[in-house]
């Protein structure tokens, strides 16, 4: 899968990478410009669902704090979803779009994600689809905060490594708002995630009585990396995660 020419020029460090999913090259993503306010916009990538497999679902994914939508993980998961019949959309938050490294304040992150949700709901190729939102780490957390405030149009949420608390600070939970989300949720969490272990996520789900499903990546860290001694190829880990997300999304 090659990047659109404009993005390839803007981010040359990612331009040469290609991804294949289940032996089949996915269609190239389309580029969308989403207006956030009168002066600012962000770039989104739409990975179209494979013909003949379309599920009538869109999954919007926000990136984590230390990457952008062109990271290997984001491109791989979006391509995998599309190959399995899910329309996938990724996007840059304003700070990454503008070449900055420090995440924006909460309100600015949320307003950006809310604008992307609106764009997905009204896009001519997606507006008949049901919508799932989420993302990697921070991207998933911001999606959850937006859904907690106003979940209109959101059929479900997918969290790929939910940052329940800062590493080493299990008392500083970022979970109080989750009880305000009415839509079903899927937590994909590494068993040894320093931002929230399987046990910690399971406790939040139980104590807050969330309409949630937990899929644990055995031996996985916050990036779902597993130790070589476990004998599980990393590509297999990622493929399994993608399969779980698709299975859960199609069942909504």
Predicted regions and their residues:
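Catalytic active-site module of serine/aspartate enzymes centered on a nucleophile-bearing elbow/loop
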Residues: 229-252
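Short alpha-helix in the alpha/beta-hydrolase fold that links the catalytic acid
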Residues: 74, 174, 183, 196-205
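Catalytic histidine neighborhood in serine/cysteine hydrolases
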Residues: 208-225
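Serine-hydrolase catalytic machinery in alpha/beta-hydrolase-like enzymes
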Residues: 32-130, 149, 224-232
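Short beta-strand/loop motif that positions the catalytic acidic residue
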Residues: 181, 187-189
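Primarily recognizes the serine-hydrolase "nucleophile elbow" in alpha/beta-hydrolase
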Residues: 113-180
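Acidic catalytic loop of the alpha/beta-hydrolase fold
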Residues: 192-195, 222-223
């Amino acid at each position: 899968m090659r990047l659109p020419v404009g993005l390839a020029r803007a981010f040359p460090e990612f331009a040469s990478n290609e991804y294949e999913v289940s032996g089949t090259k996915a269609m190239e993503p389309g580029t969308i410009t989403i207006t956030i306010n009168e002066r600012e916009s962000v770039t989104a990538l739409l990975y179209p669902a494979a013909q003949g497999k379309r599920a009538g679902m869109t999954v919007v994914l926000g990136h984590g704090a230390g990457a952008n939508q062109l990271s290997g993980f984001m491109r791989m998961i979006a391509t995998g979803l599309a190959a399995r019949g899910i329309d996938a959309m990724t996007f840059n938050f304003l700070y990454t779009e503008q070449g900055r490294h420090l995440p924006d304040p909460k309100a600015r992150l949320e307003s950006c994600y809310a604008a992307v949700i609106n764009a997905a709901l009204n896009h001519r190729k997606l507006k008949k689809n049901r919508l799932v939102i989420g993302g990697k780490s921070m991207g998933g957390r911001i999606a959850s905060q937006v859904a907690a405030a106003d979940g209109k149009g959101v059929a479900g949420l997918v969290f790929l490594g939910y940052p329940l608390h800062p590493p080493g600070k299990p008392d500083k939970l970022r979970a109080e708002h989750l009880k305000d989300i009415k839509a079903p949720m899927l937590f994909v969490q590494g068993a040894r995630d320093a931002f929230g272990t399987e046990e910690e996520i399971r406790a939040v789900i139980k104590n807050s009585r969330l309409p949630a499903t937990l899929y644990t990546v055995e031996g996985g860290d916050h990036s779902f990396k597993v130790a070589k001694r476990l004998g599980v190829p990393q590509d297999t880990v990622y493929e399994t995660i993608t399969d779980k997300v698709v299975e859960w999304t199609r069942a909504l």
